[in-house]
Amino acid sequence: MATHRDNFYERVSQKNQVTEMACEEHFKNKGYLHRFGWDKMPSQVYSMFKRLPQSLKSMPDYILHSKKGTSFIESKGYANQLKLKKRDYEAYKIWNKFEIPFYIFAYDCPKKKETIINLNTIIEKAELGLYEEGAYENDGNEYYIIK
């Protein structure tokens, strides 16, 4: 499993797609799940990636079309604690303004446990200061610990 210590190219490589495979398996009978994010983009786009605004870098991984409607799905893999970078959180809030429900498919890779979290729930708890916070040692990126 790729971690925050790996660069973008490592994180999106085929060998690190455990979370995406679990997400696709979870939603396969719940509607049409369409790949939307950067993982399947042509390699030419990667060279421009650093110049993009954060809201585009943090686009959701999938769009789900089901009988209940359309939703954005972001898949996040983790071990022990789900850490949501604050910059991703801010970008997801922008995507959330499209009036399309936004969900995080959180996958605990070692335990093979999945949880679906509505972004609105995360926003409410973050605004109330209910999440512990931290920062990665390698790059200083701040995050919320989502429980």
Language model features by range: what are they?
Residues 35-37, 72, 103-106:
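A structural signal for short, well-ordered beta-strand segments and their strand-loop junctions
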Residues 79-89:
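Active-site-adjacent loop/helix micro-motif of nuclease/hydrolase catalytic cores
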Residues 6-13, 35-68:
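Active-site metal-binding core of divalent-cation-utilizing nuclease and nuclease-like domains
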Residues 1-24, 32:
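Nuclease catalytic cores
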Residues 31-32, 100:
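Short phosphate-binding/catalytic loops that engage adenosine nucleotides
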Residues 115-147:
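Intrinsically disordered, low-complexity terminal regions enriched in charged/polar residues
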Residues 27, 60-79:
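Conserved catalytic cores of phosphodiester-cleaving nucleases, focusing on short active-site segments
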Residues 93-123:
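Nucleic-acid nuclease catalytic cores
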